[in-house]
Amino acid sequence: MQAEPQKTWTIGALVKWATDDFRARGIENPRLDAEVLVAFALGIDRTRVIIESLRPLEPAELALLRDLVKRRRSREPIAYLRGEREFYGRPFRVDSRVLIPRPDTETLVDVALARTAHVSLSMRLLDLCTGSGCVAITLARQRPTSKVLASDVSPDALAVARENAYRLGAYNVAFVESDLFANIPAGSRFDVITANPPYIATAEIEGLAADIRDYEPRGALDGGADGLDFVRKIVDVAPAFLDDGGVLAIEIGAGEAPDTRALFEARGYVDIEVERDYGKIERVVSGIRPRG
């Protein structure tokens, strides 16, 4: 009896198989995920995935793709599988040591740039909870004559951020391991302080999508009982590190704007503003340093 011939997998067949598999497992955007993984594995863009759909896959390519599909089945984020995520038009290296940069956080960059448009070219900026460094590095590249200090409590996160700064040519960024302001040099003054702190309420962590809950660093997510533990500390201490007229801008979670605004008001900040993200959710609260 003759052996049955082995199936020849084409790019198109693999995309369909992965799409059907992801859809059956309840993964959002199954077709997009399949195309992105195939494009990444083959080193081509998504357009070529469609154009070359009839091209047979080499055994090594098929093996790599099957491994990627298996990992995605387990909800490992696409950004970790690719090792990269775009932010503000730049490719940032990411892995499980850091939170994945999201489009919502681009709002934080926009607010910082808009509220410091009047500041001299030698702007001094502090970015707390920097993670991958996406905010600090983006601001450094957008304002190349500025001086940026990026801090994080995690040495692992700082290693990723340093690599991103080097790869993206952000040579005006310095890094410090610090639990919020703990290791920021006394007497330092900044024109703007940005922060994307953990802001998800502890009780809500288990209800997050598996991609987030099971893979992204919990320390970068858990903001305490009401999600505002870190926000309170930052709002309270930041004036000691802001120059006259300096701006504090903090990213927050959905529904947290009223309480965060109240914290700013109670601490005496002025010109308080709330900015919405691309999804029209109140995402960033900012204010000017209180006098005195």
Residue ranges and their predicted role:
Residues 225-288:
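Conserved Class I SAM-dependent methyltransferase catalytic core
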Residues 199-230:
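Mobile active-site "lid"/loop adjacent to the S-adenosyl-L-methionine
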Residues 82, 177-178, 252, 276:
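Short loop/edge segments at beta-strand edges and connector loops
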Residues 1-30:
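Non-catalytic nucleic-acid substrate-recognition regions in nucleic-acid-modifying enzymes
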Residues 37, 75, 105, 135, ...:
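Residue-level signal for inorganic ion chemistry
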Residues 22, 116, 165, 238, ...:
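Conserved hydrophobic residues forming the short capping helix/wall of the S-adenosyl-L-methionine
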Residues 2, 31, 36-115:
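Conserved AdoMet
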Residues 103-207, 255:
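Conserved SAM/SAH cofactor-binding pocket of Class I
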